[in-house]
Amino acid sequence: MSEVDSIIGNKEKLESSTYKTIRESNKPVNLVGDIFENEQAISPIISKVKNRIRGFVQIQNGCDHRCTFCIIPYGRGNSRRVGPKNIVKQIKLLLEENYKEIVLTGVDLTSYGTDLEKKISLSKLVKIILNKLPQLNRLRLSSL
């Protein structure tokens, strides 16, 4: 399609080198890798909006299920998670910014921790968060 300048994969869109490659190219660029090829790390992303009460912390991305009706594994890759220590750290930063409610987000939250060497369930993660951050008034779970 002549109107398309570049195609960028979900993993590649997060890499600064992708945009340098596009900028330096004089022709359309296809930068879509195999999303199942290697395990992608996800970093917790603090989502802050000034003058808001609710802060979002991504704890999981991707999905290991291959439901016939769903495209998520092909767009997000296999399930991967952020470790509990980093999650607590991110929530603490949001609480310091006076957020009153924290929302843990992910594509398939129920799979949280299944890829960890020391398996940890979502309920165990919630207990860790509440024990380490007693000042947290509200904790919500949200999934796609």
Segments (PLM) and residue ranges:
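Active-site core of PLP-dependent enzymes with the aminotransferase class I/II
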Residues: 115
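Alpha-helix-loop-beta-strand connector modules within alpha/beta enzyme cores
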Residues: 118-139
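Proteins enriched for Cys/Gly/acidic motifs involved in redox and nucleic-acid/cofactor modification
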Residues: 1-112, 127
